[in-house]
């Protein structure tokens, strides 16, 4: 088998700044440069680099200024080099992926690409950037998409004239690590709600374009609610929430259960309903192990173990473990009776009380005794009746014991 190995020296990947350039960098830019260079050298050592440790690395490890020469990027002078480096990289990848070719056990070093910084010089950057960029034609400081490489070569002259406009933020490119970092850290956070995202932007100076996930989170601050319901006047921050709310007025239920055909207005409600058919109970009680189909049911159940009563009546101070119990209790203070019988007009504070009352009109008796078959309107009446049978059975057993002893 043929093993393809690409020799790389530190000279091929070094990045340099003159003394004047270094002083013009901000502390954050210097720290970014230091991190990139130290990681680059670490990558070279991990793939077999055996040369002596360069002076620039020694300086950076001591947090000193790395003045290593006048040229900012030896061997790189124009945008055409970006195209050349990327072509070489793709050729190497194609060679390694060709059938019959064995890949060396040593990981190939990350290549470096070139980019103009705010001072008109060229600096090197880890090619994690190229994982999302197939050609430099689609990537340039001004954010303009170019269809052909010749357009890019001509465009870089105009770009050089607009350095201040292109780099209004005056920041270096950020080193990219797509997805989660090895320690599980979420790299970017929203300043409004502190929610973190796993996708990093490629360019720090184009936050609204390159960091799409973070931008979508920031584009509507939580204080703004531009989507207003014409039916009830309720306002929402995001259009998706507004659309879901409108279904409460229109009665639309686009999510149907494939097992029983029941439809729901929200997908999350359908998922909860489907657990009835599948028998899945993913939420277990931490104390007794009892499982529930919904997380809220587990939370309510666990309060029976902890004794927590978070819902307090503002009128009398009585507390409850569930919010529904508090809502029922409040109606005692307000005198509200929203449930009205359509037969006799009698009103009730709870729907369950109305259902019980409704059976007096319909004659329905759903609770039957297993001993004698007698039926009742309400379950408490059945419980009282069953105690009669229990006492009779106990008395009969006592008589049998007495007769047996004699």
UniProtKB/Swiss-Prot annotation:
PROSITE patterns: KRAB, ZINC_FINGER_C2H2_1, ZINC_FINGER_C2H2_2. It is found in: Nucleus. Its main location: nucleus. A zinc finger (C2H2-type) spans 227-249, 255-277, 283-305, 311-333, 339-361, 367-389. GO terms for cellular component: nucleus. Residues 8-79 form the KRAB domain. Belongs to the krueppel C2H2-type zinc-finger protein family. This is Zinc finger protein 793.
């Amino acid at each position: 088998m043929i093993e393809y190995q690409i020799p790389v020296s530190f000279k091929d990947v070094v990045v340099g700044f003159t003394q004047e350039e270094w002083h013009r960098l901000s502390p954050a830019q210097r720290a970014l440069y230091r991190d990139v260079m130290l990681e680059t050298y670490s990558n070279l050592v991990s793939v077999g680099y055996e040369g002596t440790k360069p002076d620039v690395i020694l300086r950076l490890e001591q947090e000193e200024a790395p003045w290593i020469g006048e040229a900012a990027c030896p061997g790189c002078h124009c945008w055409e080099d970006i195209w050349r480096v990327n072509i070489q990289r793709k050729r190497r990848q194609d060679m390694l992926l060709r059938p019959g070719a064995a890949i060396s056990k040593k990981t190939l070093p990350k290549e470096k690409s070139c980019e103009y910084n705010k001072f008109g010089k060229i600096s090197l950057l880890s090619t994690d950037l190229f994982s999302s960029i197939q050609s430099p034609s689609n990537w340039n400081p001004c954010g303009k998409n170019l269809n052909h490489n010749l357009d890019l070569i001509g465009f870089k002259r105009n770009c050089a004239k607009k350095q201040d406009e292109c780099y209004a933020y005056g920041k270096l490119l950020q080193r990219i690590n797509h997805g989660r970092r090895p320690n599980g850290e979420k790299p970017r956070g929203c300043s409004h709600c502190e929610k973190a995202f796993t996708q990093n932007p490629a360019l720090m100076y184009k936050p609204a374009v390159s960091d799409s996930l973070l931008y979508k989170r920031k584009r509507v601050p939580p204080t703004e609610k531009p989507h207003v319901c014409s039916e009830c006047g309720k306002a929402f921050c995001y259009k998706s929430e507004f659309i879901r709310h409108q279904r409460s007025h229109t009665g639309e239920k686009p999510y149907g259960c494939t097992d029983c055909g029941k439809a729901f207005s929200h997908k999350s409600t359908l998922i909860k309903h489907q657990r009835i058919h599948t028998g899945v109970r993913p939420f277990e009680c931490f104390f007794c192990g009892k499982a529930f189909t919904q997380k809220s049911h587990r939370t309510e159940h666990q309060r029976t173990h902890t004794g927590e009563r978070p819902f307090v009546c503002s009128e009398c101070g009585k507390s409850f473990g569930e919010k529904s119990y508090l809502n029922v209790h409040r109606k005692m203070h307000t005198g509200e009776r929203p449930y009205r019988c359509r037969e006799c007009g009698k009103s009730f504070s709870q729907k369950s009380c109305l259902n019980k009352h409704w059976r007096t009109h319909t004659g329905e008796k759903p609770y039957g005794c297993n001993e004698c078959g007698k039926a009742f309107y309400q379950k408490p009446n059945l419980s009282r009746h069953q105690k009669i049978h229990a006492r009779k059975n106990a008395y009969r057993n006592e008589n049998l014991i007495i007769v047996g002893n004699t």
